[in-house]
Amino acid sequence: MTSTSGSGRDFGELRRVVVKVGSGIIAPAGRLDPPVIERIAQDVTTLRDKGLEVVLVVSGAVAAGYLGMGSDRLPVSVVERQAAAAVGQYQLMTMFASVFEERATVVAQLLMMQDDIEDRRRFLSARHTLQELLSRGIL
């Protein structure tokens, strides 16, 4: 398959792309930026419409969650960061699920840590899960 982006870029035989979005993009100043997330959803949808499988990797749960915890500063301790991530992860998934639902796209999340990559059994399990999601058209 040959695909091109809106900029005319030729994707050649590319089948799958990984889009990485960091906290500085989606949660500047500790708040999720809905217009930015909307734009990401549109761009991802455009890629999918061109026949590409898209894996969206999003960081930013800590940045999105610390204000929701009532804090006015980024968390420093491991416990604070984990609590902020727990709050922020829900906010991220809620917002992404909403913007992609408008585009008839189901989203899923895989939460992974370094140990999941280093342990062969856990890595293979995550890979098989991702392959199953992609085969069903789930983002």
Predicted regions and their residues:
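Nucleotide/pyrophosphate-binding catalytic subdomain
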Residues: 1-139
